């Protein structure tokens, strides 16, 4: 029995051996991890709400000396999906009667990925369809009653230009997100001057701040430690954070960027640089914060579209920071504003 236990403990998916009465004779470590209430000698009730679906299947398989498989979804709040495979084994050592060997493959991550992909396609379709519908309506109007009206033509052409710009921004952000995700597993290796990257990002948004009547305040420690990073990617992340702060701050408000060495108790747990962008906007309800980095998620959908937002900016920021082995934290107070802080690990010194 000990040798059999060692063998199944080396299998990464949950494995159980059931006797004729469908009691658990043997289970591996992965099974105990997936089903915390599992006990050797207990029945299927220790599998929680799974047992109602598979009890009869197991009995039929044992009676027929055959094999079977079934996919089930649990009734838990956070549903899990399992592919359960069962096979009758005869003359197994230490088991004089026919037994069932059962494996559980957790399909939940694949199920979630499929759902996210479907949602993503639906969102992209909606985001593109809306401006196309608007442009189609403007063209129809220009071809009809407004064709001889210069003022109306100017108005509708301006609106069409705005919708085209919106689609252009959407396609640009989709391409950026796709590129970042494709490179996410490969952490940058080259040292990067954080101060220069911050300076580049500030220069890129200065004109927008002036146009919107916002003040930029900068507090950056000179000669910050180097990180391992890609300048264009990190600059894109900082520009996205700064543009959001500029767009959502109140009229005449101030956007503050600060960058310092992170304290020892920072979320990364090691030497790091933290770059914080603070705005004086309306703030974000606490319940909305966990979803801010989801694709196409907007707290105020109408306002986001009015300022040309695609709903992808913070998703891009998150994936860029993940590639740099960093992370983003968000703090906000309704009525006062928000602070977005990027933490980036400091590059380890090369031994000589």
Language-model features, listed with the residues they occupy:
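Conserved micro-motifs of the catalytic ATP-binding
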Residues: 182-187, 226-229
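PAS-family sensory domains
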Residues: 2-73
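Conserved catalytic submotifs in the C-terminal HATPase_c
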Residues: 188-191, 210, 215-225, 262
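PAS-family sensory/regulatory modules and their coupling/dimerization elements
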Residues: 43-109
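Short helix N-cap motif at coil->helix boundaries in the Bergerat
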Residues: 194, 283-291
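Short alpha-helical segment of the dimerization/phosphotransfer core of two-component systems
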Residues: 162-167
């Amino acid at each position: 029995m000990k040798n059999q236990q060692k063998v199944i403990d080396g299998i990464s998916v949950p494995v159980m051996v059931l006797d004729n009465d469908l009691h658990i004779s043997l289970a591996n470590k992965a099974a105990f991890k997936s089903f915390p209430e599992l006990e050797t000698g207990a029945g299927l009730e220790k599998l929680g709400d799974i047992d109602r679906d598979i009890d009869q299947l197991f009995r039929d398989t044992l009676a027929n000396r055959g094999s079977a498989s079934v996919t089930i979804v649990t009734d838990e709040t956070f549903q899990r999906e399992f592919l359960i495979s069962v096979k009758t084994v005869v003359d197994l050592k230490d088991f004089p009667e026919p037994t069932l060997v059962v494996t559980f493959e957790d399909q939940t991550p694949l199920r979630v990925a499929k759902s996210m992909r479907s949602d993503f396609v639906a969102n992209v379709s909606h985001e593109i369809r809306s401006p196309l519908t608007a442009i189609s309506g403007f063209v129809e109007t220009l071809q009809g009653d407004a064709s001889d009206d210069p003022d109306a033509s100017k108005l509708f052409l301006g609106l069409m230009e705005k919708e085209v710009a919106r689609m252009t921004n959407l396609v640009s952000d989709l391409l950026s997100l796709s590129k970042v995700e494709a490179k996410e597993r490969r952490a940058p290796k080259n040292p990067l001057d954080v101060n220069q990257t911050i300076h580049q990002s500030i220069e890129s948004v200065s004109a927008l701040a002036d146009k919107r009547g916002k003040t930029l305040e900068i507090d950056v420690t000179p000669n910050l430690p180097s990180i391992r990073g890609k300048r264009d990617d990190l600059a894109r992340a900082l520009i996205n954070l700064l543009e959001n702060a500029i767009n959502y701050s109140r009229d005449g408000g101030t956007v503050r960027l600060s960058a310092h060495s992170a304290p020892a108790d920072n979320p990364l747990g090691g030497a790091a640089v933290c770059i914080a962008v603070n705005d004086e906007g309306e703030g974000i309800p606490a319940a909305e914060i966990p979803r801010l980095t989801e694709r196409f998620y907007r707290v105020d959908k109408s306002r986001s579209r009015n300022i040309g937002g695609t709903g992808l900016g913070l998703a891009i920021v998150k994936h860029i920071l993940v590639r740099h082995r960093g992370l983003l934290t968000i703090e906000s107070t309704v009525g006062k504003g928000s602070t977005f802080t990027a933490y980036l690990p400091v590059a380890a010194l090369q031994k000589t």
